[in-house]
Amino acid sequence: MATHAALAVSRIPVTQRLQSKSAIHSFPAQCSSKRLEVAEFSGLRMSSIGGEASFFDAVAAQIIPKAVTTSTPVRGETVAKLKVAINGFGRIGRNFLRCWHGRKDSPLEVVVLNDSGGVKNASHLLKYDSMLGTFKAEVKIVDNETISVDGKLIKVVSNRDPLKLPWAELGIDIVIEGTGVFVDGPGAGKHIQAGASKVIITAPAKGADIPTYVMGVNEQDYGHDVANIISNASCTTNCLAPFAKVLDEEFGIVKGTMTTTHSYTGDQRLLDASHRDLRRARAAALNIVPTSTGAAKAVSLVLPQLKGKLNGIALRVPTPNVSVVDLVINVEKKGLTAEDVNEAFRKAANGPMKGILDVCDAPLVSVDFRCSDVSTTIDSSLTMVMGDDMVKVVAWYDNEWGYSQRVVDLAHLVASKWPGAEAVGSGDPLEDFCKTNPADEECKVYD
């Protein structure tokens, strides 16, 4: 088995957010076709409502907690699950649902999705996926407005105007905004106007008024009252920011450039056709397409000390999934070796960034990183040091599955901070880690 296989350890304490059900990856087709078995989906209750009940009755039955025999609540017990809507059931929307469905005892309940294709497209594309394989969950069309996933009813609506979506009627707590369209305050704010409480944008946000969070980097800054609209950044920022944080803390980043060799996405053209970016207008499966990316600059949104120090470009290539970041930086610390750099990553991977960052020592290729749960995997054999202050680091990431795991993590973080949720942890990942690992070198600050 590949040595980079990541332990899918949560960034959220287990009383609020449990681990992915599998600790170790299987390669290469592990996502939902081999990794997620139906018997493991025990975290979701089957509906006990009869066939004549309305969709709303069925949803209520699934989210209202079962009666308990004691008047004393169990510490850390989730009293009621937060109701989630997915707006846009494309690559990230469907990956998010699969990732969420594989989590046991999630504090979330997906009750509705908005997709222009209706129930037929939503059910078929969820069940059969060219990258993930066949979903082992039972996916059925219940009626022309409802699908079921292992008996769990999910309403399907089709409306391109967020203001007309039934979020108030359904009591939606969190909207996963996955269209890539409503990424600014006015756009994403339409979900709030429609009755939702919170919005998580699965893309870089436009506007300084929307805070960005990258799990493993700055999630400790989130609080329920900080903002109603937040961003999970981009897949590339989720790859770059964790290891940039390690490099900056250990060696001090002076400046650097990044290139992401990125799989093609739906924003490109299958055949040559008009596009606002003339390079993305060219056939995605036939070309290496240089294009822009804001991922390097966006790192400063979660690591403010790096503002103005990083920049980069993207090369879109003819692969459907998995991407790789190549970062070259100048550092303050002199006299480093490649092993010094890799050791810093191993320390982070086994400590406060466990489940977010991993290190791979095997000579692998992109397909081996499909469905990697972590945000970033350092390819240790490609780490280089030139002169006394130049460092090159290469890191792999699954730009769909790994990113969607972080969206679930961020949604779980939002749930853990919800009014009435049991307070757990200090909010500082390093401090929480050091409570159980006091002998670790990084924990001396807490002595």
From Swiss-Prot:
Question: How would you describe this protein's topology in the membrane?
Answer: Peripheral membrane protein
Cellular compartment(s):
Plastid, Chloroplast membrane; Plastid, Chloroplast stroma
Query: A GO molecular function for this record?
Result: mRNA binding
Q: Which CDD domains match?
A: GAPDH_I_C, GAPDH_I_N
In this chain's numbering, which residues are marked as the site (Activates thiol group during catalysis)? H262
The keyword Kinase is annotated on this UniProt entry = no
Q: In which pathway does it act?
A: Carbohydrate biosynthesis; Calvin cycle
Q: List, alphabetically, the Gene3D superfamilies matched.
A: Dihydrodipicolinate Reductase, domain 2, NAD(P)-binding Rossmann-like Domain
Q: What is its main location?
A: plastid
PANTHER family tied to this protein:
GLYCERALDEHYDE-3-PHOSPHATE DEHYDROGENASE 2 (PTHR43148)
NCBIfam families from the xrefs?
GAPDH-I
Give the record's subunit note: Tetramer of either four A chains (GAPDH 2) or two A and two B chains (GAPDH 1).
**What is the name of the protein in this document?**
Glyceraldehyde-3-phosphate dehydrogenase GAPB, chloroplastic
